[in-house]
């Protein structure tokens, strides 16, 4: 297991800001707007919801990113908590569009968030001319205020219309998809490198339809920042987790890390290095209706490229020479 340092209390508070900001939207801002409907300030929520109706399709039409939000100093403190870094192995030309596979999911995808949804690690300087979009569950964009906060950071919906729009309007767009999805969160255990990928081929088909280059990435350390309690598939808790996922779209995982006090257990992640290695892009032809054989061919090439990327860098970032990358 990787060594865990004790971050400063300030860094810990900055990290807590991330989930607490969403809780504040859910439990304070949204109820406040409902309350305002019954006061003399009722025009404010009415105007917002009218605008929300007119703006409903924006998450599927490129979103509305904010350079100001992406450059908030709070993200640099979250970066330094672990720390989080990004490693470029090849340049990405702004003359093409890219579909990037993000691996592994981990529990909270700290690496993908910090590297692609903020400028804390200098993405724009590392990949000039490339605009990153990290895709997430579509239903987040149906929640008032949450949708604006996500779009400001460059997050897009993982829906097919949203991805099609980004890959067909202009060049220099990079869409990141956490291919393993929420199911991979249950594989997020320290010292394991297991990805759900063998049957996940839709992203390859989409890349072929648009002639987008496939970019493999692997985030070392993503599964090391929390310990997770795993339940047997016949247990009631596992059945509850499966039911929870069917309703809400993600698993209710039981996990723990460290607290503000050194040596004690809490819900803060362990302060262990997270490094996202961005691999060499794999050029694809543009085929409007790719055959299954063509999809299988490029899916196999992608898995091979990802496997090589992992093997080339694993010993530099906490993995042993004998550690293998497994695909489910």
Curated annotation (Swiss-Prot):
Tagged with keyword Membrane: yes
Q: Where does this one sit in the cell?
A: Endoplasmic reticulum membrane
- Tissue specificity field: Predominantly expressed in skin, where it is limited to the sebaceous gland. Expressed in more mature, centrally located cells just before their rupture and sebum release. Also expressed in all tissues except spleen. Expressed at higher level in thymus, prostate and testis.
UniProt organism field: Homo sapiens
Q: Provide GO CC annotations from the record.
A: endoplasmic reticulum membrane
The protein's predominant localisation is endoplasmic reticulum
Which terms under GO biological process does the entry name? arachidonate metabolic process; lipid metabolic process; wax biosynthetic process
Extract the GO molecular function terms from the UniProt entry.
Answer: long-chain-alcohol O-fatty-acyltransferase activity
- UniProt keyword Electron transport present: no
Enzyme Commission numbers on file: 2.3.1.75
Spans traversing the lipid bilayer: 12-32, 34-53
Q: What role is this protein assigned?
A: Acyltransferase that catalyzes the formation of ester bonds between fatty alcohols and fatty acyl-CoAs to form wax monoesters. Shows a strong preference for decyl alcohol (C10), with less activity towards C16 and C18 alcohols. Shows a strong preference for saturated acyl-CoAs.
Give UniProt keywords alphabetically. Answer: Acyltransferase, Endoplasmic reticulum, Lipid biosynthesis, Lipid metabolism, Membrane, Transferase, Transmembrane, Transmembrane helix
Annotated membrane topology is: Multi-pass membrane protein
Family the entry assigns = Belongs to the diacylglycerol acyltransferase family.
Its protein name is Acyl-CoA wax alcohol acyltransferase 1
Q: Name the catalysed reactions.
A: a long chain fatty alcohol + a fatty acyl-CoA = a wax ester + CoA; 1,2-di-(9Z-octadecenoyl)-sn-glycerol + (9Z)-octadecenoyl-CoA = 1,2,3-tri-(9Z-octadecenoyl)-glycerol + CoA; hexadecan-1-ol + (9Z)-octadecenoyl-CoA = hexadecanyl (9Z)-octadecenoate + CoA; decan-1-ol + (9Z)-octadecenoyl-CoA = 1-O-decyl-(9Z)-octadecenoate + CoA
- The enzyme class is transferase
Q: Which gene encodes it?
A: AWAT1
